[in-house]
Amino acid sequence: MALWGGRFSQESSALFKLFNDSLPVDYRLVEQDIVGSIAWAAAITQVGILSQDECEKLQQALKELLSEVEGNPELILASGAEDIHSFVEQSLIAKVGDLGKKLHTGRSRNDQVATDLKLWCKKEGQQQLVLLAKLREALLALAERELDAVMPGYTHLQRAQPVAFGHWCLAYVEMFERDISRLEDALKRADTCPLGTGALAGTAYPMDRYKLAESLGFASPTLNSLDTVSDRDHVVEICSDASISMMHLSRMAEDLIFFNSGEAGFIDLDDEVTSGSSLMPQKKNPDALELIRGKTGRVYGSLIGILTTMKALPLAYNKDMQEDKEGLFDVMDSWSICLEMAALVLSGLKVNRENTLKAAQQGYANSTELADYLVAKGMPFREAHHVVGEVVVHAISEQKPLEDFALEQLQSFASIIEQDVYDCLTIESCLAKREALGGTALPQVQSALAAKKVKK
């Protein structure tokens, strides 16, 4: 029976029930709904709705129900209940009879689902933080293994300047650390308890909402009942944080897909994260990375979905808000599997150092060093930039690197060039000069890695 049937003289149509019921989605909140109900039983006992004996019977029955449904979603889904709240209440009544009908006193499904969802977000958010930390550790381990491998750095997907592979790894460590910080902030804002605010105007029973919040592990109760039952900022924020993190995952995946390509050949991926072709027997496809890149779009879609759902809703609760969960659940599922898969890919990744070094030595990646050399000799940078551009054009026409030019040839472009120019054109020199904080000089990369390893 529906929880709201007394007002109606006709049964809902089968189509409406199919359209309206949310159990196929919100069954995932069963643990939170039961935990919240256990806390609510204690709260209404303190204001005289239940006796202590009744409270204990209800709480025991709820704990039994939680044990029965853990790992058994089929039991919930087969019930035909409208939503997870209905399932829990109907199951409770089946266990303790009419006593179960007292539990909802002073409570609305509006504050109930808001509480369930925040509890779920807090729990799942902590699990995401663990996965982000594991990915960070995988990047640090890779940076340590391949710290001094030299590779070309890119702008516009054109070879630009040489960088250490460890520097590339630490760039993504920075990104994922920001993801951790963002999610931690979001979880702090979600750490307020909605329970006890009723449908929209607050509960009529003088309960201690601070104590209720504490019993559920929240930092504090919410302070405005209208806002409380209308608020889904935590859903939006977590989906937004996930979207930013997925952007970082997708960018890393794209880098690695390119590095793994036949055209680059910079890295090899383990067989366990790749697949083959049904037609072409030679293929080894980076499917794990491509799926990370692909799943990013669906996470973005869920963020846009919840923003669009919420953008014009009047206070307080509206049924539109039932649509908040499917996207959120999919976001968290997609994000978590992508974090796990990315860490697995990194753990088995091997750098082909000969190929990365050869690529770094091509494409005139030492051109900036020649310009800096001219500046050190007294030439204004803008003039030096122009001179080196002319040198590069000539080098391309002769199909040889800058360091292979005879001194006389280089002096034909700038007479201040001397024999010591060749010292600055080596890959080693290119790296070593980037010794300012945040640069790719190996001592800087080693220092940055050491600092990251200390920071947990």
From Swiss-Prot:
One of its GO terms (cellular component) is cytosol. Its EC number is 4.3.2.1. It holds the Pfam family ASL_C2. It is found in: Cytoplasm. It is an enzyme of class 4 (lyase). It comes from the Bacteria. Its main location: cytoplasm. InterPro entries: Arg_succ_lyase_C, Argininosuccinate_lyase, Fumarase/histidase_N, Fumarate_lyase_CS, Fumarate_lyase_fam, Fumarate_lyase_N, L-Aspartase-like. Keywords: Amino-acid biosynthesis, Arginine biosynthesis, Cytoplasm, Lyase. GO terms for molecular function: argininosuccinate lyase activity. Pathway: Amino-acid biosynthesis; L-arginine biosynthesis; L-arginine from L-ornithine and carbamoyl phosphate: step 3/3. It catalyses: 2-(N(omega)-L-arginino)succinate = fumarate + L-arginine. Belongs to the lyase 1 family. Argininosuccinate lyase subfamily. This is Argininosuccinate lyase. It comes from Shewanella woodyi (strain ATCC 51908 / MS32). The lineage of its organism: Bacteria, Pseudomonadati, Pseudomonadota, Gammaproteobacteria, Alteromonadales. The gene is argH.
